[in-house]
Every structure is written in C-alpha cells, then in structure tokens.
Amino acid sequence: MYQRMLRCGADLGSPGGGSGGGAGGRLALIWIVPLTLSGLLGVAWGASSLGAHHIHHFHGSSKHHSVPIAIYRSPASLRGGHAGTTYIFSKGGGQITYKWPPNDRPSTRADRLAIGFSTVQKEAVLVRVDSSSGLGDYLELHIHQGKIGVKFNVGTDDIAIEESNAIINDGKYHVVRFTRSGGNATLQVDSWPVIERYPAGNNDNERLAIARQRIPYRLGRVVDEWLLDKGRQLTIFNSQATIIIGGKEQGQPFQGQLSGLYYNGLKVLNMAAENDANIAIVGNVRLVGEVPSSMTTESTATAMQSEMSTSIMETTTTLATSTARRGKPPTKEPISQTTDDILVASAECPSDDEDIDPCEPSSGGLANPTRVGGREPYPGSAEVIRESSSTTGMVVGIVAAAALCILILLYAMYKYRNRDEGSYHVDESRNYISNSAQSNGAVVKEKQPSSAKSANKNKKNKDKEYYV
C-alpha cells in the first residue's frame, strides 16, 4: 500500500497534470511520507507495550512492614523447564569456590539464595558463604538427617532454620529458596509452605535502624557495643569473602547434582562454566549441560517443572523484611503448578555502624512462592498479574495506522480525480486555440502565394508586351 501511494503521488506530480497537478503531487508527497512513518511508529509503539505488565502487591499480616519490591516476569527462555547450569559432584567429593576481590567484598543486611539439587545423602553441605578472616559471619545450606536446613551467624548467635517435613534425600530433584533480612529468615522447599524464623531480640530492628541514622558516627560503635551487651540481634553480614559449593572443605562433601545456584545476584555455576577468573574448581566435579537426571520418570518430570522457579531476573531495589507465615499443609497436587516468577532485589546498604569495611550495596534475590493449585499467594508476597489490557497499546497503534492509511488514500484519490478533470479542460482550450491559429495561418499562407503568382504573371506579361 505504501508503494502504491507513492506511485499515486508521483502521478500527481507529473507534468501531464499541469501546474495545479504538480503542486498537488508535491503536497501529497510531503504529507504521505511522514504520515505513513507515523503510522508505522504507532504500530511499533503498540507492539512494545505488550512487554509491559501491571504489577500488583499483596501484603498480608506480618511482623514487619514490607518495602515495595519491583517484580518482573521471567522471560520465556527461562520458563521452559531448563534447569540452568548443572554440575555433578561424584564420589570422593569436589568443590567450586568463588572469591570476591579484596576491594569488592560486600556487607549485606539481606541475602537471597536459590538452588536446585538431587542427592541420596543424609549428611552434606551444599553451599557455605564466609566473611573475611577473623569476623566469623557465615551462612550455610546443609542436609542433616535427610532434611534441608540453613544456619547463619551475623555477629550475635547461630540462627538455624530447617524444613522438617520434606524428605529431600530421595534422589529426586528439589528446589530450595532461602531469604535473610537481619536476623529474620525464611525457607521453602519445592511447593511446601514457607517456614519463618524470628530470633529473640530482633523485634525492634527497623525502628533501631531509623534511630541510628541520627546518632553521630563517632558514637555508633559505642551504641552497637552497648546494644550487643543487652542482647540485641545484629543484622549485617560483614565483608563476604568466599562462596564454597560442595562442602569438601567442611568435611561433609556433597554427592549428587547441583543446578542454577543463585546468591545475591551471582549465578556462580554459570560463572564456573564460563571459566570466571574468580572461581576455582577442585575434586570430582563435572559440568553437565542438561536437566538433572533422576531415578524415575515421575521425578524427571518434577525436575523439569520445578526448575522453572530457579532461574532469576535481577533488578535493583531496596528490600526490608518480607516474610510469610506458615500456610496450610501441602497438597498432593503436582509441582508443575508452582510459580515461575522469581523476585530479586538488592540488599539495602546498611546504615549500621557494625560494618568493619565500607559498605557497598550488593544485589540479592528472593524466590517468591505462591500456593499450589492457583490459590491466593502467601501473606507478604507479591504476584504478577498479566491483564488483558496489555494488548490495548497494540490495538490502538494498529487502528491509528489504518486510519492514517485510509485518509492518505482518500486524499490521493481526490487529488488524482481533480488532476484528470483539469487536464481535460486545459487540453480542450489548447486545442481550440491551436486550431484557430492554424486556420488563420492557413488562410494567410494560401493568400500570399496566389498574390505572388499574379504579380509574376503580370510582370511576365508586361515583359512580353515590352519586347514584342
């Protein structure tokens, strides 16, 4: 249609259309091109609006106020059941170690960990994060008596959280998600309800953080020491130095498969597969580029569906405590109905003077679950709702482009019709003038030769008479 309109404009501007037609053609060309381009831009704008989704937050009753968190839906490439980068840890044990550069060690108030695994062990250490030497802060994901649990210490006491209902050493594929905010923690295995942990002395941390902003910097250390003496729970994981995967160094080597590890914005297994300079691999560790195999066909399907929740999109936001209470007991509905929306947020830069090194904000991630079977989400969680109105932009763009094309076509037809009528009248007038001119000229031309002949005849006759 665009080429047809250009040809119409060219016809309007041709010399056969006269001066009026040429001006109309030039005017048509001036308007056709920008209007058509604007229509195409309208279509593009409408199509681009499809990627936007409305974000809704559901806040339930919880102990702490939750800071709004931006959520983005995982792209299609991450929702196809792919388990991400997978490593097999064979008999004898192996280890993958990531070390932060000395000048880039983060101190965080909140941490996010997600990983998929399959094993038959009753005792093993999957992942451990340690602070710099001498500080003593750590976070450890482990298997104890066939149950998954996390233990961490951020400067006060060891805090432990465990899922005692789920059996995870059955050789099937499982996904575990852990979040920490200060001394609070949540843990979820597959589609089981979220477990919470609120240590003693941690009820007023948010108000304390606000009040500490008004305390002079030189007095911050004194206040922290006083609070520590009073049993106050500290909240900062200081100067994180290493991430150790496999547990060989802790004397409890892991045997099985680990997939899609994510910790505070770092996809460590992906980095290991890409030969990152900060990663070292030792022992019996082998890279596998496929979804983890399992003992049965049922567990294979479970692996592919469950891993849909382990791939993570990142965004930088501020995160406070966002926890959920225990829900109902798990149902027997398939895991394939779990959500594939993963929530990621950066850990807030601590205002706590507990930090030993200067704080640098670091990114973190939170796997945000919903209830199985399509029921309402857990309190305090957030859910992405894709509304049908997301196609409104595309519809508006297409309608606008179609309207512009129709107007341009009508305008071109109108100018083309006027050009035809004008050329007819002009040609008729020109023919009349030329015919009259030709008739007058013919009469004159006919008269002039006859007079010349008569003059010559008279002269000849006179000569003849003269000589005779």
From Swiss-Prot:
Q: Which domain of life is it from?
A: Eukaryota
What processes does the entry annotate via GO biological process terms?
AMPA selective glutamate receptor signaling pathway; angiogenesis; calcium-dependent cell-cell adhesion via plasma membrane cell adhesion molecules; cell-cell adhesion involved in synapse maturation; cerebellar granule cell differentiation; chemical synaptic transmission; establishment of protein localization; filopodium assembly
Membrane topology per record: Single-pass type I membrane protein
Effect listed in the UniProt record for changing residue 238 to A: Loss of NLGN1-binding. No effect on CBLN1-binding
List locations, semicolon-separated: Presynaptic cell membrane
Task: Describe the subunit structure.
Answer: The cytoplasmic C-terminal region binds to CASK. Binds NLGN1, NLGN2 and NLGN3, DAG1 (alpha-dystroglycan) and alpha-latrotoxin. Binding to neuroligins is calcium-dependent, and the binding preference ranks as follow: NLGN1 > NLGN4 >> NLGN3 > NLGN2. Interacts with CBLN2 and more weakly with CBLN4. Interacts with CBLN1; interaction is CBLN1 hexamer form-dependent; CBLN1-binding is calcium-independent; isoform 1b does not interact with CBLN1. Interacts with CLSTN3.
Name by which UniProt lists this protein:
Neurexin-1-beta
